[in-house]
Regions:
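Intrinsically disordered, low-complexity terminal regions enriched in Ser/Thr/Pro/Gly
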Residues: 1-138
Length: 138
């Protein structure tokens, strides 16, 4: 019907492993997702499909992010809720937002393949998106 908006769903427009992140779309990609023990591993994400709140002449979003590391068999080695709590205010409705998270890979971490689980929660809509990506520690 004319005038009715389709409900939006939270989704990742861009999600990449990175060696370093400097800003919006300014990062050094790590396409293989391989990280050396004792170093910092980054994930760069651009997210869209979130709900917006409105107050006076401003639009705002509220997003939180959880992260976990699992074995390929699904055993959780590490998890942390709310590693990022994001509230941003805008004059115009944004198409997307970007952020990064990082993990310091312990020097003693066993070499091998793992699964990073990144959960993005839209606090205004009450929805969440779970993204699983393989990562290798060497």
């Amino acid at each position: 019907f004319a005038g009715e908006e389709e409900p939006v769903s939270l989704y990742i427009e861009k999600g990449e492993w990175a060696y370093e992140v400097r800003g919006d779309d300014d990062y050094d990609p790590n396409p293989e997702g391989r990280f050396k023990r004792g170093e910092r591993g980054y994930a760069y994400l651009e997210v869209a499909g979130f709900d917006l709140g409105r107050e006076d002449d401003f639009y705002f979003l509220r997003i939180s992010v959880d992260v976990a590391l699992e074995t390929k068999n699904g055993f959780t080695l590490f998890s942390q809720k709310d590693v990022l709590e994001l509230e941003e205010w805008y004059l115009e409705p944004p198409k997307n937002t970007w952020f990064y998270i990082y993990v310091n890979i312990p020097w003693w971490a066993p070499r091998g393949g793992y699964v990073a689980v990144i959960t993005v929660r839209d606090l205004l809509a009450g929805t969440e998106l779970v993204e699983k990506r393989e990562v290798e520690v060497y």
